[in-house]
């Protein structure tokens, strides 16, 4: 069964990022990032309000990014957004795992994030540290254009890419 609402959401808000291999700045080991869909935009207050039924932001505005939320609240948002679109939530936020993040893989297997296979998850989630660095440095396109190791995103000269 096709989920038309999910497809509409993905078409409007998501973008596919091609994965690849690289050596993150914090380790000497090469790591692999798998192809992944990520939101094109920061989570807006309007989207947060629709899912969480509250808006704790200090700087109000439907199209402004949500702020003043905790990391745990962001995980809860991901789970609720997953449920809204009929997807299996990624995070086990049950009381038994309070203060300890656990990942729910498909089939009900609950594992620690450091051994989780995110290809075996279905719902929305936050990017891992390795994925986040991959995005920030330009990913596969930056490797192909030989800009991946620039000091700043897009250049070694901060004046060319910042204000």
Region spans (language model):
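A short glycine-rich, aromatic-capped structural motif
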Residues: 5-57, 62-83, 135
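Intrinsic disorder/low-complexity segments enriched in polar/small residues
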Residues: 3-6, 11, 152, 161
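Functional-site microenvironments in short loops/helix caps that host divalent-cation chemistry
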Residues: 60, 71-163
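A short, compositionally biased domain-edge/stem linker segment
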Residues: 1-9, 107-114
């Amino acid at each position: 069964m096709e989920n038309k609402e999910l497809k509409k959401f993905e078409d409007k808000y998501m973008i596919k990022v091609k994965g690849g291999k690289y050596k993150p700045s914090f380790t000497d080991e090469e790591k692999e990032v798998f192809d992944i869909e990520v939101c094109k935009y920061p989570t807006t207050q309007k989207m947060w309000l629709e899912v969480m039924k509250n808006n704790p932001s200090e700087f109000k505005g439907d199209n402004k990014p949500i702020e003043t939320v905790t990391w745990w609240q962001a995980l809860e948002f991901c789970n609720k957004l997953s449920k809204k679109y009929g997807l299996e939530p990624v995070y086990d936020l049950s009381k038994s795992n309070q203060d300890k993040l656990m990942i729910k893989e498909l089939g009900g297997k609950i594992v620690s994030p450091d051994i989780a296979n995110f290809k075996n998850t279905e719902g929305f989630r936050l990017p891992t540290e390795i994925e986040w660095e991959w995005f920030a440095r330009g990913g596969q396109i930056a490797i192909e254009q030989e800009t991946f190791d620039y000091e700043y995103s897009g250049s070694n000269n901060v004046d060319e890419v910042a204000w």
